[in-house]
């Protein structure tokens, strides 16, 4: 960590099709071994399927799905006097997006559908309907924070 000033985050170029920075970040999360064009084709295919299924615009449906997966609180381990407590802390906005994207991609990869585009489309439509593995993950994180609310005074 720098001592003088905090480092400003790098600017990310918006994606070529929709012009969304959020979608560009999602493409980068999905990308494996630097194959960005493959990741883009998977995501654009999934968004097309999602738009047909929901009847909304693709980007609108994507953002709705992401909103349902974003966590507001999480637990962090804190060692106090020889014992470790799970302390609930609020999640900063950039981390909310990062976690939501990561959870959606992980859930899509674990699905058993035919292609990755179809798996991603199914996971995004489930997330938009407030169900699915990614939403369950968010609920679990919130449940953990709720269960450990008694240790909130250990926050740092």
From Swiss-Prot:
The record's section on Gene3D superfamilies has: Ribosomal protein S7 domain
Q: Where are the transmembrane segments?
A: none
Pfam families assigned to the protein according to its UniProt record, in alphabetical order: Ribosomal_S7
| Molecular function as annotated in GO | rRNA binding; structural constituent of ribosome; tRNA binding
Sorted alphabetically, which keywords does the UniProt record give?
A: Ribonucleoprotein, Ribosomal protein, RNA-binding, rRNA-binding, tRNA-binding
**Might you name a Gene Ontology BP term for this protein?**
translation
Q: Which CDD domains match?
A: uS7_Bacteria
Q: Which GO terms describe its cellular component?
A: small ribosomal subunit
Q: Which domain of life is it from?
A: Bacteria
The entry assigns this protein to a family as follows:
Belongs to the universal ribosomal protein uS7 family.
Q: What's this chain's function?
A: One of the primary rRNA binding proteins, it binds directly to 16S rRNA where it nucleates assembly of the head domain of the 30S subunit. Is located at the subunit interface close to the decoding center, probably blocks exit of the E-site tRNA.
Which HAMAP family does the entry link to? Ribosomal_uS7_B
Assembly description = Part of the 30S ribosomal subunit. Contacts proteins S9 and S11.
This protein is called Small ribosomal subunit protein uS7
Q: Which organism is it from?
A: Actinobacillus pleuropneumoniae serotype 5b (strain L20)
Q: What is the lineage of its organism?
A: Bacteria, Pseudomonadati, Pseudomonadota, Gammaproteobacteria, Pasteurellales
